[in-house]
């Protein structure tokens, strides 16, 4: 039986560019902080392990196993603290023909099991020169209901959130690195996708010289449940009540009136 109420946290952090070791330490520390607050699910920003500025040449120089220890420790933390974890990270996939990099989000449950690995589908501008695009939108069934994942620019198209909604998503997490000059779109996109699909959306952003912060959780009617500052690192926490979805959908019949 799924839990109708649960506590989530968005870890709005400053990411140290290209410093995997320090970023991982910060991620583990935030997980421990969240556990002390009895958080059920914690989400981190996009590319939280390495940042956004790494070049194609620098990617190629990374060792093949640079993620292995990090993911193993994430699984250990999830199991030890009994917490679900979503982290945006740099994924490396090597085949006989090539080595590809993805802008991904790993989702680990409170038993340390990897539930999903979502890859960013829509790549923003020069990201196309560094990363390979994903090809599906992920929704996973959990003890907290059905959880969807989108990464940053995926949110700027109406189809991804609608696809996840039609797959049954009740809350969508959006790990992001959202810039200052697009802050107005951040607020609009989160609210609009939430309202049009009548579900919760949790957007987790970073804070630094280019990211606007303002991590926020949006309710099924598009209203803001809670919002972080634009400059400070913080653990933004709130209780999600899934009953609000049915309440809002009873008042706003978008999905029942949707022409299939």
Question: Which stretches of residues belong to each language-model region?
Answer:
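Extreme N-terminal starter segment of soluble prokaryotic enzymes
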Residues: 3-10
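Short, glycine-anchored, charge-dense loop/turn motifs used at functional sites
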Residues: 8, 107-115, 218-226
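Short polar catalytic/cofactor-binding loops
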Residues: 12-17
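Cys-nucleophile CN-hydrolase/nitrilase-fold catalytic domain and related Cys-dependent amidase chemistry
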Residues: 20-21, 28-109, 179-195
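Short beta->alpha transition motifs characteristic of CBS
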Residues: 56, 106, 118-124, 216, ...
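CN hydrolase (nitrilase-like) catalytic-core segments centered on the catalytic cysteine
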Residues: 66-86, 155-234
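Active-site catalytic loop in hydrolytic enzyme cores
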Residues: 96-167, 180-182, 188, 192, ...
């Amino acid at each position: 039986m799924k839990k109708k109420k649960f506590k989530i946290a968005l870890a709005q952090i400053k990411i140290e560019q290209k410093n995997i070791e320090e970023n991982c330490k910060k991620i583990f520390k935030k997980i421990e902080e969240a556990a002390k607050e009895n958080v059920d699910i914690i989400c981190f920003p996009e590319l939280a392990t390495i940042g956004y500025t790494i070049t194609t040449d620098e990617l190629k120089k990374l060792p093949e196993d640079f993620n292995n220890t990090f993911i193993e420790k994430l699984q250990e933390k999830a199991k030890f603290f009994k917490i679900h974890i979503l982290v945006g990270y740099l994924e490396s996939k090597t085949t006989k023909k090539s080595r590809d990099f993805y802008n991904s989000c790993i989702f680990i449950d409170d038993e340390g099991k990897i539930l999903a690995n979502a890859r960013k589908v829509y790549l923003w501008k020069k990201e196309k020169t560094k990363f390979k695009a994903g090809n599906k939108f992920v929704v996973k069934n959990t003890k907290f209901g059905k959880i969807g994942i989108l990464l940053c620019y995926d949110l700027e198209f109406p189809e991804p959130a609608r696809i996840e909604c039609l797959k049954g998503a009740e809350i969508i997490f959006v790990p992001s690195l959202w810039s200052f000059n697009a802050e107005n779109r951040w607020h609009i996109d989160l609210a609009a996708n939430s309202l049009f699909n009548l579900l919760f959306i949790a957007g987790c952003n970073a804070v630094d010289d280019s990211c606007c912060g303002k991590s926020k959780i949006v309710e099924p009617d598009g209203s803001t449940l809670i919002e972080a500052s634009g400059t400070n690192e913080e653990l933004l926490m709130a209780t999600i009540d899934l009953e609000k979805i049915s309440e809002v959908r009873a008042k706003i019949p978008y999905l029942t009136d949707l022409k299939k």
